[in-house]
From Swiss-Prot:
Keywords of this entry: Apoplast, Manganese, Metal-binding, Secreted
Family membership: Belongs to the germin family.
Major site of localization recorded for this protein: secreted
Species in which this protein is naturally found: Betula pendula
Protein name: Germin-like protein 2
Length: 14
């Protein structure tokens, strides 16, 4: 369930 969270976090970090 981290893959989905990472996708959102990366969007903000990016």
């Amino acid at each position: 369930a981290f893959q989905l969270d990472t996708n959102l976090v990366e969007s903000l970090q990016k």
